[in-house]
Regions:
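Structural/interface elements that position substrates and couple domains in central-metabolism enzymes
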Residues: 1-126
Length: 126
C-alpha cells in the first residue's frame, strides 16, 4: 500500500549518466506510485527539469529523513559511489535497487544497520 508513503526515486533518465528522460521507465514508476497515493520526490544529477512530468527536480541529493522508501531507478555513477548508510543516517527506509547500483558491501552494511534492501533480477538474495 503506497497511500501516504513518502518515496524518493533516484534517477529519472532512461540510462546511466545522461540527462535524457524520454522513454524512461522511471516515468511509469512515478506515475503509478502517485496514482496509488504516494508522495514521490525524484532526483537525478543530470536532470533539472523533467519535461514529461512537468516538474523541476532538486539540484542536490535530498536528505532521506522522513522517507519511507528509496528506489534506485537509474544506475548513475553518483549512486554507485554513494555511502548509503551514511546518507541515510538515522533514517531506516526500505531500499529497492531496481538497477543493481548498490555494491554487495553497501547492501551488507545497510542490512547490518537494520535497513531492508530489496533488489530486482540478482537471483542471489543480496
Amino acid at each position: 500500500n503506497c497511500e501516504g508513503k513518502a518515496i524518493l526515486v533516484l534517477g529519472v533518465s532512461y540510462r546511466q549518466d545522461v540527462g535524457d528522460t524520454r522513454h524512461s521507465p522511471a516515468e511509469t514508476l512515478v506515475r503509478t506510485l502517485e496514482i496509488r497515493g504516494a508522495q514521490v520526490t525524484s532526483y537525478d544529477p543530470f536532470v533539472q527539469y523533467w519535461k514529461e512530468m512537468d516538474r523541476s527536480l532538486p539540484a542536490e541529493l535530498p536528505a532521506a529523513e522522513g522517507v519511507d522508501a528509496v528506489v534506485f531507478a537509474t544506475p548513475h555513477r553518483e549512486f554507485q559511489v554513494l555511502d548509503v548508510p551514511k546518507w541515510l543516517g538515522d533514517s531506516c527506509p526500505v531500499i529497492l535497487d531496481t538497477v543493481n547500483v548498490m555494491t554487495d558491501k553497501c547492501r551488507k552494511l545497510c542490512r547490518k544497520a537494520g535497513i531492508q534492501v530489496e533488489s530486482v533480477g540478482r537471483g542471489d538474495g543480496l
